[in-house]
A protein has these predicted regions:
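Active-site neighborhoods and metal-handling regions in enzymes and metal-associated proteins
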Residues: 1-195
Length: 195
């Protein structure tokens, strides 16, 4: 009946007289901050001052909604994570990485291609970083002795994985990662279990 959507909304709010009007805004969570400034200004201009004073952030509702999963989604999620870990395992293998030749960018695009080949999509652009004993070597070529870190996520049926893993590239004379590295990761994993 009312041709202007903002005026119609103001009339609806007036008729319902809610105690609060929750908007999709958040200073802390981007996922709960989807209201555009233009929309906010249009809404503000259409509202009465008493209506406008009832505005609150719907941040908690938005985050809770994103955290909510159905039983079917919860049944699928372990498979999604398993696929994510399997892709990373293959990506970090010597079938994909040739030390002194493969770059981190090569590996990033290998991850994207692998996901595409599986008919899936990435949730965000994967990243692969190198940590080195010798800090002045800044090139992106993966070398023996490098510690690799990947941040990787895939999407399937509205679910997203977000997985971070590390891999150590063995030196020619090594058969396992250095004891101090294994110990550091063991302590880190213990802390994760506690938290």
């Amino acid at each position: 009946k009312e041709p202007n959507q903002w005026t119609a909304l103001s009339k609806l709010i007036d008729s319902l007289n809610p105690n609060q009007i929750a908007l999709n805004t958040s200073k802390d969570y981007g996922h709960a901050d989807g209201l555009h400034l233009t929309e906010f200004n249009e809404l503000k201009n259409a509202m009465t001052p008493s209506q406008f004073n009832k505005i609150v952030s719907a941040e908690k509702l938005g985050v809770a909604w994103l955290e909510t999963r159905t039983a079917k989604e919860m049944a699928i999620f372990p498979t999604l994570l398993a696929i994510s870990h399997q892709i990373i395992k293959e990506g970090f293998s010597n079938r994909v990485i040739q030390p002194n030749k493969t770059s981190t960018n090569d590996l990033v695009w290998w991850f994207r291609q692998k996901v595409s080949d599986l008919g899936l999509s990435t949730w965000f652009h994967p990243s692969v970083e190198i940590q080195r004993r010798v800090s002045n070597e800044k090139d992106a070529i993966i070398r023996p002795g490098d510690l690799l870190h990947v941040d990787f996520g895939i999407s399937y049926l509205r679910l997203n994985s977000d997985v971070q893993e590390h891999a150590y590239v063995l030196l020619p004379n090594e058969t396992t990662a250095p004891t101090e590295l294994v110990s550091a990761f063991s302590k880190t994993n213990r802390l994760q279990d506690i938290l």
